[in-house]
Curated annotation (Swiss-Prot), chain A:
Organism of provenance: Buchnera aphidicola subsp. Schizaphis graminum (strain Sg)
Subunit note: Composed of 13 different subunits. Subunits NuoA, H, J, K, L, M, N constitute the membrane sector of the complex.
Catalytic reaction equation(s): a quinone + NADH + 5 H(+)(in) = a quinol + NAD(+) + 4 H(+)(out)
Biological role: NDH-1 shuttles electrons from NADH, via FMN and iron-sulfur (Fe-S) centers, to quinones in the respiratory chain. Couples the redox reaction to proton translocation (for every two electrons transferred, four hydrogen ions are translocated across the cytoplasmic membrane), and thus conserves the redox energy in a proton gradient.
Membership in a protein family: Belongs to the complex I subunit 4 family.
GO biological-process terms attached to the record: ATP synthesis coupled electron transport; electron transport coupled proton transport
Protein location: Cell membrane
Name of this protein: NADH-quinone oxidoreductase subunit M
The protein's Enzyme Commission number: 7.1.1.-
Record has Transmembrane as a keyword: yes
Curated annotation (Swiss-Prot), chain B:
HAMAP family to which the protein is assigned, alphabetical: NDH1_NuoN_1
Record's protein name: NADH-quinone oxidoreductase subunit N
Gene Ontology cellular component terms for the protein in this record: plasma membrane
Assembly information from the UniProt record: NDH-1 is composed of 13 different subunits. Subunits NuoA, H, J, K, L, M, N constitute the membrane sector of the complex.
Keyword entries, A-Z: Cell membrane, Membrane, NAD, Quinone, Translocase, Transmembrane, Transmembrane helix, Transport, Ubiquinone
Species of origin: Buchnera aphidicola subsp. Schizaphis graminum (strain Sg)
Record carries keyword Metal-binding: no
Keyword Glycoprotein attached: no
Topology relative to the membrane: Multi-pass membrane protein
Entry function: NDH-1 shuttles electrons from NADH, via FMN and iron-sulfur (Fe-S) centers, to quinones in the respiratory chain. The immediate electron acceptor for the enzyme in this species is believed to be ubiquinone. Couples the redox reaction to proton translocation (for every two electrons transferred, four hydrogen ions are translocated across the cytoplasmic membrane), and thus conserves the redox energy in a proton gradient.
Length: 501, 486
């Protein structure tokens, strides 16, 4: 029952915060924050007191901590949620960023607060659901459910009043991209399930059952491709990245942006959990193409980020570039690089979100996102330049931060399998340092273009940044804590995907 | 022709409606009383709905050679009757303001309902033709009921002419089939078809295609769709909730009956025609819906695509009878509920005005004035688009699994593209409701009428909307119900 609370609490708190809006404008955010806090407590409770490790009994994954309720029996669909170490880590990340998102939007959202927090809570609920669903239908259900509140978040709470129309267009673009990805995934899931049905005469969407029965070789590749496409559109990897930059540019800079940090991470999670596990042979065959796509988006993202004049677009492209590295880690790596991937997911989300928050602060004072209009801000602003420098450096992977550990483990892991791939990826990281430093240089150093008034960072944002910095340093200094949590699941995922072939 | 008691019981719901028609006619000629007639009509429809319960024990049953009732037809009949009830409930407040004769509305609705439910059970070409006509003739009157309004007469006239043409096609087709088979029963068609020579087969096939064309006209599939948007625009909203549902459910049920029993339809030509029609209906309906600014026209185009999805079921209904009936049931129930809510809401707003409130921009910012109502409309639109937690998602899911199970890849492609295009259209309506209201007076008018939930139409809208949500989250009862009627 404890597990179902992970979904129920965010949902109910969203509903309550929507209705409490009528009474007083401040209540919704408190309810949302309390809801997140309670969910976090639940996760901690599960983490400390339950034996959630994944272990293996004769090639059958058994998650000792799970909840199975019959749902739509005639289709063999169950409400099957379970938690293993990998999920726990992702849940911590989601909830951490969720709380930060709520804190960030604390004073920023000045209209329709109730509806805003309802949407945020629904997005978080969907994300949590994606991480704990172990029924493919349920997984798809949550995967799709995120889109609607996300659509509202983009289209309704933009920064400027005048470009409402543009926001709706971008929201539509986002929706169409993700809808295509969703439909492709639905098709692949159905193919997978029907294939299982033809072989065993059991109609089921159960992940564990589908896992032990290998897919027919003839269609394995097609199904794998469907899943892959669905995930990389959401991730996003280069040919399908069109929505991300616009999306970031327009989304409300506090609340939604941080959620993106968690939301985008559903895709690498899915790739590892579903693609790697369900289709080991096809994945192995497909690996060179995936690695190539990873390179493409890594270099392309970095180069395009270099030429951006809009801060948020720059950060978005840098995020695309890092996603490329993650894709390479998933397809080219071994167990070590998977563990690096987890650290990288965590620290990259945190540092990217922090950069977004700071860029939001800059926007708040300067009313522009255009880098060319800034310059020499170091003399005008307290704290922000220092923080930005830290997060930018962390983003490019400086030792002492989580990103360094992540990148190091990823490259180390890949080097054992494909040395050349690892070497080329290292070159990609050089570019990321170039655009990061370029950004810092153009915004904060040099002469001021205008005569800006001096200002302080908000006390709330200040503490948020401090917390984020500590999180990154924690990841950088003691990554073993995180690796311990996820070790068993990652070990299992790696072994399972290798053992079958 | 001797009818025994059991057959009479089977005819009970029909007889109740017939009796009501007679009473309504007599009452109109003796003394007009709007409230009495509306009340009588609704009650008799409910009674006839309840009397379907007695049929469950005795079906399947043949009533003479004209009708054949199965459990499945009970399901469809109940859907049609529900849509008629909804129409009468919606129409009552609308008719209160209507200047001319009000009572004939119920008469026309009843007769058309009767035609529709006879159509779902007809098993003979003669009863088929008569039922189709009985169903569509009163609709001319219903469409033209608000004849003082713009487009109303035009729509009625258009439908009259085109429906006449389609009926003549139907008749022509029937006579082609009769010329070869010498029998008007639907069941004999199957038997005869296997004994025929090739040239004769061609003729029967031609006849069948003619009949199908007439049906596709009634379902407004591409390429017989050109009338749809205009007629939707000119028809009052309360009539639309009936017009859009009952005829389509009735014709779909007869098509499903055709396609699930007869080996005639294994024919490649018919398969090709059906897939082409479905392919283009999905694409075209969704594509055109995007550009509409009138929400009644919008629903017209969207219904083309919805029925287009439904046609996919027919392609496989012979091999997968069980599953396709289940899918059809889910999809049609979704269609019924969405229709009731969609047109119910339009009707609700239109009651305070002289004309139908059917322009998109008038609904801008509805959410901030009427949150509950706007949420229900959002659910409906999401359900039409097939987003999880709504019933429409399960309809989409079932149809998608049919496509994949049977490897209908071309249709699958159009399904994918159509769904995405459709979603774009639905999202446009949805986000429109959540924008900040413009300064126009309409939205401010609504503020006064805050008690919509207390009126009968409000309750109906609320129940249908919630049904979509509940069945979307937990569709088991519905699936069990549909499985139990097979």
């Amino acid at each position: 029952m404890l597990l179902s609370l992970l979904v129920i609490i965010p949902f109910l708190s969203g509903i309550f915060s929507f209705f409490s809006f009528r009474f007083q404008k401040n209540i919704p955010r408190w309810i949302a924050l309390t809801g997140m806090g309670l969910t976090l407590l639940t996760v901690i409770r599960i983490w400390f007191f339950e034996d959630y490790y994944t272990y293996q009994i004769q090639s059958y994954t058994h998650l000792s901590y799970q909840l199975i309720l019959p749902w739509i029996s005639s289709f063999g669909i169950q409400f099957h949620i379970a938690v293993d170490g990998f999920s726990i880590v992702m849940l911590f990340l989601t909830l951490f960023l969720g709380i930060i998102a709520i804190l960030c939007s604390w004073n920023e959202i000045k209209k329709n607060e109730g509806f805003f927090y309802l949407n945020i809570m629904l997005v978080l609920m969907g994300t949590i659901g994606v991480f704990i669903a172990f029924d493919l239908f349920l997984f798809f259900f949550f995967w799709e459910i995120i889109l609607i509140p996300m659509y509202f978040l983009i289209s309704l709470w933009n920064q400027k009043k005048e470009d409402k129309k543009k926001c709706i267009n971008i929201a539509n673009k986002f929706f169409i991209y993700t809808q295509i990805s969703g439909l492709i995934m639905l098709a692949s899931i159905l193919l997978l399930v029907l294939n299982y049905y033809i072989n065993n005469k059991i109609l089921t969407f159960n992940y564990d059952l589908l896992l032990i029965q290998p897919v027919d070789k003839s269609i394995e590749y097609i199904i794998m491709l469907g899943f892959f496409l669905a995930f990389i559109i959401k991730m996003p990897i280069v040919p399908f990245h069109g929505w991300l930059a616009d999306f970031h540019e327009r989304s409300p800079y506090c609340g939604a942006v941080d959620i993106i940090g968690a939301l985008l991470k559903t895709a690498p999670y899915g790739l590892l959990r579903y693609n790697k596990m369900l289709f080991p042979n096809a994945t192995e065959q497909f690996a060179p193409i995936a690695i190539f796509l990873g390179f493409l988006s890594m270099f392309y993202g970095a180069w395009v980020a270099f030429s951006q004049v809009n801060i948020k677009r720059l950060i978005a492209y840098s995020s695309i570039s890092h996603m490329g590295l993650m894709l390479i880690a998933i397809y080219g790596g071994n167990e070590i690089s998977f563990q690096g991937l987890i650290i990288q997911i965590l620290s990259n989300s945190i540092s990217t979100s922090a950069l977004f928050i700071l860029s939001g602060q800059i926007y708040k004072y300067l009313k522009t996102q255009d880098i060319s209009e800034m310059g020499g801000l170091w003399t005008n602003i307290y704290w922000i330049p220092g923080f930005s420098l830290f997060f930018a450096l962390s983003n490019l992977g400086i030792p002492g931060t989580g990103n360094f550990i992540g990148e190091f483990l990823i490259l180390f892991g890949i080097f054992k399998e494909h040395p050349l791939v690892s070497i080329i990826s290292t070159i990609g990281i050089i570019f990321s340092s170039i655009y990061s430093l370029n950004m810092i240089q153009k915004i904060y150093y040099g002469l001021s273009k205008h005569d800006f008034p001096k200002f302080f960072l908000n006390i709330k944002e200040f503490w948020i940044s401090i917390v984020l910095i500590f999180a990154l340093i924690f990841l950088g200094l003691i990554p073993q804590k995180i690796l311990n949590i996820s070790f068993e699941s990652i070990h299992f995922i790696y072994n399972f995907s290798k053992r079958i072939q | 022709m001797i009818i025994n008691l059991q057959e009479l019981i089977a005819l009970l719901p029909f007889l109740i409606l017939l009796l009501t028609v007679v009473i309504v006619i007599l009452s109109i000629s003796y003394n007009r009383n709007h409230f009495f007639i509306a009340f009588l009509t609704i009650i008799s429809l409910i009674v006839s709905l309840c009397s379907l319960y007695f049929l469950i024990a005795i079906v399947p049953i043949d009533i003479t050679s004209l009708f054949h009732i199965t459990k499945r037809s009970i399901l469809y009949i109940s859907m049609i009757i529900i849509s008629s009830i909804a129409t009468c409930v919606f129409a009552y407040p609308w008719l209160l303001k209507y200047a001319f004769n009000k009572e004939e509305f119920y008469l026309l609705t009843l007769i058309s309902t009767l035609g529709a439910i006879f159509l779902t059970i007809s098993n003979h070409m003669a009863s088929l033709f008569i039922s189709v006509e009985l169903m569509s003739l009163p609709i001319f009157g219903l469409i033209a009921y608000s004849n003082s309004q713009k487009y109303s007469l035009e729509a009625s006239f258009k439908y009259l002419v085109l429906s006449g043409v389609s009926s003549s096609f139907l008749l022509l087709g029937i006579s082609w089939i009769y010329a070869i088979s010498g029998n008007l029963s639907l069941l004999c068609l199957n038997q005869i078809f296997s004994d025929l020579s090739n040239s004769e087969k061609m003729m029967v096939l031609f006849g069948i295609i003619m009949v199908l064309m007439s049906f596709f006209f009634k379902l407004s599939m591409v390429p017989f769709h050109l009338w749809t948007a205009d007629i939707y625009q000119g028809t009052p909203a309360s009539v639309l909730s009936f017009f859009s549902v009952s005829g389509k459910i009735a014709i779909f049920s007869i098509l499903l009956y055709f396609f699930s029993y007869f080996s005639v339809f294994d024919n490649k030509v018919i398969f090709l025609i059906l897939s082409l029609i479905s392919f283009f209906s999905i694409l075209f309906g969704n594509l055109m819906a995007i550009f509409q600014t009138n929400i009644k026209r919008f629903f017209g185009y969207s219904s083309i695509s919805q029925i287009g999805y439904l046609l996919i079921i027919l392609l496989v209904s012979k091999d997968e009878y069980f599953f396709s009936v289940q899918t059809g049931g889910i999809f049609l129930l979704n269609y019924l509920c969405t229709n009731i809510v969609y047109f119910g809401v339009i009707n609700l707003f239109s009651n305070s005005c002289d004309y139908d409130i059917d322009s998109i921009h008038l609904y801008k910012g509805l959410f901030w004035v009427q949150p509950l109502l706007a949420s229900i409309v959002t659910i409906v639109l999401l359900s039409l688009g097939g987003i999880p937690i709504t019933l429409g998602f399960f309809g989409k899911f079932c149809i998608f699994s049919i496509i994949i199970k049977n490897h209908l890849w071309t249709i699958g492609a159009s399904f994918l593209i159509g769904t995405i295009l459709g979603l774009y259209g639905y999202l446009r309506l949805i986000v429109n409701m959540y924008l900040n209201p413009s300064e126009q007076s309409f939205i401010n008018d609504i503020k006064k009428s805050n008690f919509w939930l207390c009126s009968p139409s409000g309750i109906l809208i609320f129940i249908s909307g919630i049904m979509l949500l509940i069945l979307g989250i937990y569709p088991n009862p519905l699936i069990n119900l549909i499985n139990s009627v097979q």
